Amino acid sequence: MALLIITTILWAFSFSLFGEYLAGHVDSYFAVLIRVGLAALVFLPFLRTRGHNLKTISLYMLVGAMQLGIMYMLSFHAYLYLTVSELLLFTVLTPLYITLIYDVMSQRRLRWGYAFSALLAVIGAGIIRYDRVTDHFWVGLLLVQLSNISFAIGMVGYKRLMETRPMPQHNAFAWFYLGAFLVAAVAWSLLGNAQKLPETTLQWSILVFLGVVASGIGYFMWNYGATQVDAGTLGIMNNMHVPAGLLVNLAIWHQQPHWPSFITGAAVILASLWVHRKWVAPRSAQTADDRRRDPASSE
């Protein structure tokens, strides 16, 4: 849980840094390429094939391509249509995607308690930024939702792989980032605009920070933390970036939120986490234990 909180704080700066200094100035495909390329370099020394078959390696590369490569390309392009605060708002459905996709991958029936606690988090994040949208609402909304789904598939896929095809986390992330880099390299070669490369030291510095720290270290901490909690807690923590990101926007770029809705929404998100950990997760665990005992007692 602590790793998820630390990463949320770290990522709160990423939204504003990209939105304020790179979006519209630097080609989004190049930004993705550099960001995941630097992250891949961080973990390149841990790339190992011994003891892991080709299918397992390919699956870790696939979840990296989904969670980072494709997700970044969609979300970075969305910055052309949305403000930072609007983009933050439109990510609030991610907890629902995480919960639903985890149940599908686990071949389980939908756990309505998990969906309920995730829905509370969605409501809380929505309260924070309900008041205004731009003319590009529908295009931005579509791009961000596709990005959210890609992120959720990758994150849940990584969690499931660690449950079914485990390998040391640092080795797994070496393949994870390599998968993301390959997707980004293909996209840049086909769609990139070489006329819109970074021109200032500040832009390059931000890209290095986003690649090495926010992506390289941040996603490792996030996905490692994801293996330590249940899917419901994971989905709710994913929505904490909304108030965190808006606070950073306020503190550094002096963007003023609507304080009553901000405080109310943040409180609802925190309440959803408390409800989930207090009631939903224990009840789900108890139900699973009961189901395991029933076949044994019938024998």
Curated annotation (Swiss-Prot):
Annotated EamA domain residues: 3-128, 139-274
UniProt-annotated location(s): Cell inner membrane
Protein name according to UniProt: Biotin transporter
One cellular component term from this protein's GO annotations in UniProt: membrane
Originating species: Salmonella typhimurium (strain LT2 / SGSC1412 / ATCC 700720)
A Pfam entry, by short name: EamA
Role: Uptake of biotin.
Transmembrane segments: 2-22, 26-46, 56-76, 81-101, 110-130, 137-157, 172-192, 202-222, 233-253, 256-276
Gene: bioP
